[in-house]
């Protein structure tokens, strides 16, 4: 909600902290700051999330293993010196009691022992695919509608492949005062990714869809954020349902990030 750092750069920053603020032999962060940053400065209490009851340092929580940089919805950079590791996660967890605790507990119970033992998994063991949307492909069916936030959406089948083209016209926001149209590819029995430019900003979306009886259903994962939502369209109505409502208003335009230039 205001600061965007992609997963790669989050990992690099975590590595800098793991290396005590030194990068390629050069000290970038003061030694005293590093020392104070990762020790408890504030006492905290939490009955439902034990990790968050261990105290707070400088911009970081204390933890039973190392210490985490903690973002909303279960986004973490875990700095774990005991196994010389940085673990970066961009989850989409709810903010309910115990939900984020369960994520960390899974890391402590399963990933840390593997790292400590020097376990080297095979690629097929570490790659998992998010299930696609179930349904049918129909090359003769299109659908259009207006979402609750005023977005105008048109979904049309590709003529040369089993997929859809989605045109999503977003109403303007305070940061993007004019309407913007996103051209989004929708995969059938697969995920297709789209990099959409919005002025000097951008948004990255992975999408899968299918016809379920008379309803076109698509899942849109805004992969540059921890947010996913479901789109359902019939000629009479269009609905969108976020798994977890974003902190920023503005729908998809509220999730754009500065175009990264390396």
Give each language-model segment a name.
Residues 8-12, 32, 106:
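Extracytoplasmic/secreted proteins, especially bacterial periplasmic and envelope-associated proteins
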Residues 21-30:
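Structural helix-adjacent loops and short alpha-helical linkers that scaffold large soluble proteins
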Residues 34-89:
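Active-site Gly/Thr loop motif
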């Amino acid at each position: 909600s205001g600061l965007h750092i992609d997963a790669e750069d989050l990992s690099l920053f975590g590595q800098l902290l793991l290396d005590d603020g030194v990068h390629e032999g050069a000290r970038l962060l003061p030694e005293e700051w590093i020392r104070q940053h990762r020790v408890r400065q504030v006492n905290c209490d939490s009955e439902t999330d034990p990790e968050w009851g261990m105290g707070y340092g400088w911009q970081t929580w204390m933890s039973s293993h190392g210490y985490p940089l903690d973002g909303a919805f279960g986004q973490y950079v875990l700095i774990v010196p005991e196994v010389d590791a940085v673990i970066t996660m961009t989850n989409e967890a709810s903010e309910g009691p115990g939900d984020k605790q369960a994520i960390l507990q899974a890391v402590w119970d399963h990933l840390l022992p593997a790292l400590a033992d020097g376990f080297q998994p095979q690629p097929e063991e570490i790659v998992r695919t998010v299930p696609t949307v179930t349904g049918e492909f129909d090359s003769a069916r299109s659908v259009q509608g207006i979402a609750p936030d005023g977005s105008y959406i048109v979904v049309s089948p590709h003529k040369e492949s089993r997929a859809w083209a989605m045109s999503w016209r977003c109403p303007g926001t305070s940061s993007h005062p004019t309407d913007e149209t996103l051209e989004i590819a929708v995969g059938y029995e697969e995920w297709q990714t789209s990099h959409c430019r919005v002025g000097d900003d951008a948004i990255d979306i992975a999408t899968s869809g299918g016809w379920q009886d008379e309803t076109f259903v698509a899942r849109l994962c805004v992969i540059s954020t921890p947010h996913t939502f479901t789109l359902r369209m019939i000629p009479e109505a269009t609905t969108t349902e976020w798994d977890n409502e974003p902190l920023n208003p503005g729908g998809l335009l509220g999730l754009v990030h500065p175009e990264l230039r390396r």
